A protein has these predicted regions:
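Core SAM-dependent methyltransferase catalytic element
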Residues: 202-225
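A short acidic, Gly/Pro-enriched loop at the edge of an enzyme's catalytic core
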Residues: 102-110
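Short alpha-helix
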Residues: 185-202
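Class I SAM-dependent methyltransferase SAM/SAH-binding core
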Residues: 44-46, 52-101
């Protein structure tokens, strides 16, 4: 995740996800709706990996009384979140750090979008357990990120489709084959079955797939009682 401390990479961030993630605005909208099923009008929502601020802005606009806390390890990305939020920024609390930086209080819901695929299996499990520890029983967690089949040929095929989507949206890719191989080797990608297993190990129940777009998958799950 070192690129998120690169000022030029950070400057490109607000445009990049829109061209790389199919239906990003709809993903934010659906995430908010899934949270809204359980989060009260003045509820507390924890956003892990909040740098950039795109989902924070979507939630702040749609649910003006939610108390939003965004956590991210990258100071430049948090600065970008402030810019993205604009006049909404005073309504959002931002913390630099990983999940451990978030206060150990009971939130009404949590979100983690486009973040978990940067974490190893052990780091993901730890992050999910810490998220569970900060949620009220029955509270929703919404997460979405890259998740591809485990078989090498299937993994490369789906990553190829993702890269094709990027390039069709004008994202410059000098060598698609090299990009595909780099993603396969550098990102600790998990298959959907492993993702669900991690949720269960971390203490989440009733997991449901709500979003699938090429390599991206999104789940909602609920903190166990």
């Amino acid at each position: 995740m070192s690129s998120f401390n690169d000022p030029q990479a950070v400057a490109r961030y607000t445009d990049g996800p829109l061209r790389q993630v199919p239906g990003l605005h709809a993903l934010h909208q659906m995430s908010g709706l899934l949270l809204h099923e359980h989060v009260p009008s003045n509820g507390r929502v924890l956003v892990l990996g909040a740098g950039g601020g795109l989902e924070l802005k979507a939630f702040a606009e749609a649910y003006p009384h939610w108390r939003l806390l965004g956590v991210d390890p990258s100071a430049p990305m948090l600065d970008l979140a402030v810019q993205t939020l604009g006049p909404l920024a005073p309504r959002v609390e931002l913390l630099k750090g990983c999940i451990d930086a978030a206060p150990a209080i009971e939130f009404d819901g949590a979100v983690c979008l486009l973040t978990m695929h940067f974490l190893s299996f052990a780091e993901r499990l730890q992050a999910l357990r810490e998220l569970r520890r900060r949620l009220k029983p029955g509270a929703p967690l919404v997460m979405a990120h890259h998740s591809v089949p485990e078989a090498p040929d299937e993994k490369l095929r789906w990553l190829g489709r993702h890269v094709a989507f990027m390039t069709s949206n004008g994202v410059p890719v000098a060598n698609p084959a090299t990009t595909i191989e780099a993603m396969a080797s550098r990102l600790p990608l998990l298959c959907p079955e492993a993702e669900v297993d991690l949720l269960e190990q971390a203490g989440f129940e009733r997991h449901e797939l709500f979003y699938a777009a090429f390599t991206f998958k999104g789940w909602v799950a609920y903190a166990g009682l």
